[in-house]
Regions:
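Contiguous, structured surface segment used for ligand recognition
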Residues: 20-149, 480, 496-507, 511-524, ...
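Active-site-proximal loop/turn and secondary-structure-junction residues that shape catalytic pockets
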Residues: 187-191, 247-253, 316-318, 367-371, ...
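Flexible, acidic glycine-rich loops studded with aromatic residues
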Residues: 363-370, 377-537
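Feature activates predominantly on carbohydrate-active enzymes
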Residues: 91-311, 355, 467-472
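Active-site neighborhood of glycoside hydrolase catalytic domains
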Residues: 256-261, 272-388, 392-408
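Bacterial Sec-dependent N-terminal signal peptides
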Residues: 1-25
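Short glycine/serine/threonine/alanine-rich loop segments
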Residues: 72, 180, 239-241, 361, ...
């Protein structure tokens, strides 16, 4: 470590020991907090009263909180001074009410997810109030809380560099502490195919192993079996994390096309390309076999994941290098009366989205504007109204908000300038390569992300939420993934959960310190944001 980093880490420990402020570790900050008089004094004979069998996991998590903070785990029973309850009168699916008074602690929620989030908030209260926690006391408070946005996501990219199941579980453990409720898994790209498809085994036999010199499970090689993914889905669901699979088509498909060359455009059938490197190849829109294979893939993916959502890509398709040069695709274009090969995206996704709908899946696509030929003022093709779109291109989110509002599409915000966590966090920091001219996305820049874009509520009611994306070209293991995610992920968690009127950089900066210390204790790597310590307090 260099000297500024060492000093910052020492400061974390000092602040973690000295913290006295009752609310100093709440992150994301709750939307209604009422501090009250008095304290609840614990005894080692406390029990956790659980009012529903659905709350057993939340109760087990609360036992672990007490074990870590107070040194003992209360037994779970039908009643006690510590109570977890479902309350059907509460409105939001993730709403919770945490009440601490001299008589005890109660956590209520309409669903198990809300109660679970109440447990997490209680843990952060204890983390922030070190002096009272050490004496077995909890200050009185009432917190009524619910998220600003229902969709709060992070994205991992095991297609570029494979991440073992246990590593993904650890990532889920951390993200759920900050009330992210969705993990998107980018399971296919030019560099690898990472999900077992039994009807087309070559996808993994060939497409999951780009480096014959490396071991079967390595950053270059590997895939998830369907049973592994089902178990991962269950693990995540207990922690209120929905896993959305992404199969990226018709571009980003070198792994598919290496496994099944007959799916390429006709003029590329005999061409060679290097599997494992970004290659501007595409599935053919004119080949019926493409749609048969994709139908099988969508069916099997839908059977593995409990989510009724599937992300089907749709981004960065090099149409002019593929369909525009393909006799069969140009003939298809003419047969539909189209004047541009871009319009074949309507044909392609018309069939692919029909497969998703057939299997009861709601499709998500990256929002592509006609930005190959600037200005970017319209959709690349005609998105159906029942498709959710994700805005991602640098600087184009305001236009995407406008277009989706007009077209009636739901929109997820993942603007590159705020939420691309593969971008470096500081000058000369990771990733080591910057051959794309990646801009800096600092911690403060991410925190300044305002999902409302200062629009009136009626102009943004179609916005579902936010997503931080971690593209994997330079992410070779989970330690690097965590390093690039945190602390920016903490800033994004507040953008997705906390109302803008309650957000403050100065407040966040103070609440950041005990949470970084907690990440350190849990063995989660993160970048030390030493630069913010020079800011005026």
């Amino acid at each position: 470590m260099n000297r500024p980093t060492v000093l910052f880490v020492m400061l974390l420990f000092a602040l973690g020991v000295a913290a006295q402020e009752h609310l100093s570790a709440l992150l994301p900050f709750p939307n209604h907090v009422e501090q009250r008089q008095g304290v609840f004094r614990l005894s080692d004979k406390e029990t956790i009263g659980v009012g529903s069998g659905d709350l057993q996991f939340a109760a087990a998590e609360l036992q672990q909180v007490f074990k870590q903070r107070f040194g003992f785990a209360p037994a779970v029973s039908d009643n006690g001074r510590i109570r977890l309850m479902l309350n059907p009168r509460m409105e939001g699916e993730e709403q919770y009410r945490l009440t601490v008074d001299v008589k005890g602690i109660s956590i209520e929620g309409r669903t198990a997810a809300g109660v679970y989030y109440g447990v997490i908030t209680l843990d952060q209260l204890l983390l922030g109030d070190v002096a009272n926690t050490k004496q077995g006391r909890i200050r009185a408070v009432r917190i009524d809380d619910a998220p600003a946005y229902p969709f709060r996501a992070l994205m991992l990219d095991p297609a570029r560099h494979f991440l073992p199941v246990e590593a993904v579980k650890g990532y889920i453990d951390c993200m759920t502490r900050y009330k992210f409720n969705t993990l998107q898994l980018h399971l296919s790209d030019d560099q690898g195919w990472r999900i077992e498809i039994k009807s087309h085994p070559k996808l993994t036999e060939v497409g999951a192993f780009r480096n014959p010199k490396a071991s079967a499970i390595s950053p270059d090689n590997g895939y998830y079996t369907q049973d592994q993914l089902r178990e991962l889905v269950e693990y995540a669901a207990l922690r209120n994390v929905e896993i959305i699979p992404e199969i990226d088509v018709p571009g980003h498909t070198a792994a598919i096309l290496t496994a099944y060359p007959d799916l390429r455009c006709d003029f590329l059938k005999d061409s060679a390309f290097v599997f494992g490197k970004t290659d501007n190849v595409m599935l053919s829109a004119a080949n019926p076999r493409v749609y048969e294979v994709l139908d099988d893939i969508i069916r099997e993916v839908g059977d593995v994941f409990s989510s009724k959502k599937i992300h089907l890509g749709g981004d960065e398709s090099a149409i002019e290098r593929n369909w525009a040069k393909s006799p069969e695709n140009l003939e298809l274009m003419r047969s539909h009366g189209y004047t541009s090969p871009d319009q074949l995206m309507n044909v392609f996704f018309g069939k692919v989205l029909a497969s998703a709908k057939k299997y009861g899946l709601h499709a998500i696509l990256w929002c592509e504007l006609d930005n190959i030929r600037l200005p970017a003022d319209k959709y690349l093709f005609d998105y159906p109204q029942d498709v959710t779109l994700v805005t991602w291109r640098y600087g184009l989110t305001p236009k995407c908000i406008e277009l989706t509002r007009e077209s009636g599409n739901t929109l997820i915000l993942a603007p590159g300038e705020y939420t691309y966590f593969d971008y470096p966090q500081y000058a000369n920091d990771l990733p080591e390569f910057n051959n794309w001219g990646m801009p800096l996305t600092t911690l403060r820049k991410t925190y300044e992300f305002d999902p409302t874009y200062k629009l009136e509520p009626g102009q943004r009611k179609h916005i579902a939420g936010v997503m931080g994306t971690l593209w994997g070209e330079a992410i070779k293991d989970i330690n690097r993934a965590n390093y690039m995610t945190y602390p920016r992920g903490l800033a994004l968690s507040e953008a997705g959960w906390t109302q803008m009127s309650l957000r403050s950089w100065d407040s966040f900066r103070k609440r950041l310190y005990p949470n970084l210390l907690e990440l350190m204790k849990r063995g989660v790597s993160f970048r030390v944001p030493f630069e913010i310590e020079g800011e005026r307090r």
